[in-house]
UniProtKB/Swiss-Prot annotation:
Disulfide bonds join 4-12, 7-15. This is Guanylin. It comes from Didelphis virginiana (North American opossum). Endogenous activator of intestinal guanylate cyclase. It stimulates this enzyme through the same receptor binding region as the heat-stable enterotoxins. Belongs to the guanylin family. Keywords: Disulfide bond, Secreted.
């Protein structure tokens, strides 16, 4: 769906 499926809003930077 997005860049990060787990943390879309966090931009998968450091989730």
């Amino acid at each position: 769906s997005h860049t990060c499926e787990i943390c879309a809003f966090a931009a998968c930077a450091g989730c």
